[in-house]
Structures are given as structure tokens and as C-alpha cells.
């Protein structure tokens, strides 16, 4: 076996009732979130209602970016960036799987970049800052919650590329 060094600065809170700690994690960074989710399974399972109640009871304001598609689109990322800037969002809260988390990572970097988020593809040196992300992973299929990559799709060029930075863990 070859020697190696492995660094994952991701904090993981897991277990029964762990979701109840969510407001505490959010309040370390601010009192407003962009809640990002996909097709609505979090509503069908009751997770959405539970999270909204936790946010409301903790006086954490929230706006929503719903309908994040598999292979998140650049237009969705841009919409999220605009929402963060217009509403002075402090934390991004993706709830879902890899696509939701990837979209949120791209939003986190894009909201701190003065330009088109697509410019960040292949240019980690351009990512000088990123918004905090506190993810509620509902399925661990892609591992996005444990890596510094965000894969997004540019509908115009038909390209699927990644944005990468240690700031996106």
C-alpha cells in the first residue's frame, strides 16, 4: 500500500435527532438562509416542514430555491446567486442529494465572485471566498457533501464541468 495524506474538513453530525442541532450550526454564521432543494421529496417526507419549523422557532429567516434539477444548470446557479445578493443571505442550506449540494456550492462561490459563475470552471484560483454551506444530505450517493467539487451544466454550450476549491468543503 502506498502512503498518503487525506484531509476532509467536512464536519458531519449524524444520528437520531441530529437535525434539531441545525439552527445552532446556522447561527454560527448568520440568521438568514437560502434553502435549496430539488423536486419536492423533502416535502413529501415531512423533512421540509421540520426544517421550516426549526428555522422559524430560531428566528432564522429563509428564502427558497426549489426545483434544482439533476445535473444542476448554470441558470439555476445564477438564480441562486441573485437571490443571495438581493436578500443578504448569510448561509446556504441545501437539503437533498448531490445535485442540490453541487448547485449550492456553485452558488456559494458565485455569490462571492464579481462575474459569471461559469468563469470559475477550471479556475480555482478565482475562488477567493465562498458563502458558508450547511448541508442536510438525504442521500449519500455522489459524496458531494465530502468533497470540494461542484458539477454544473451550461445549457448554452451543452457542457458539464466542475468548479473546485477547498473553500467548497
Give the label of every model feature segment.
Residues 1-29:
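N-terminal amphipathic/basic leader segments beginning at the initiator methionine
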Residues 10, 20, 112-169:
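A glycine/threonine-rich phosphate-anchoring loop and its flanking beta-alpha core
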Residues 46-115, 119, 124-125:
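N-terminal small/polar loop signature for handling phosphorylated ligands or for N-terminal nucleophile
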Amino acid at each position: 500500500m502506498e502512503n498518503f495524506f487525506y484531509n476532509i474538513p467536512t464536519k458531519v453530525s449524524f444520528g437520531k435527532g441530529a437535525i434539531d442541532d441545525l439552527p445552532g450550526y446556522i447561527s454560527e454564521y448568520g440568521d438568514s438562509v437560502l434553502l435549496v432543494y430539488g423536486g419536492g421529496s423533502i416535502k413529501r417526507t415531512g423533512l421540509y416542514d421540520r426544517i421550516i419549523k426549526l428555522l422559524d422557532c430560531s428566528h432564522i429567516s429563509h428564502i427558497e430555491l426549489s426545483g434544482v434539477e439533476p445535473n444542476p444548470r448554470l441558470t439555476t446557479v445564477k438564480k441562486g446567486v441573485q437571490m443571495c445578493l438581493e436578500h443578504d443571505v448569510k448561509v446556504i442550506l441545501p437539503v437533498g442529494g448531490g445535485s442540490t449540494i453541487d448547485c449550492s456550492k456553485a452558488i456559494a462561490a458565485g455569490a462571492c465572485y464579481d462575474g459569471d459563475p461559469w468563469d470559475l470552471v477550471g479556475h480555482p484560483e478565482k475562488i477567493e471566498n465562498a458563502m458558508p454551506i450547511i448541508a442536510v444530505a438525504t442521500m449519500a450517493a455522489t459524496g458531494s457533501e465530502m468533497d470540494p467539487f461542484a458539477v454544473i451544466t451550461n445549457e448554452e454550450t451543452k457542457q458539464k464541468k466542475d468548479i473546485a476549491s477547498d473553500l467548497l468543503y
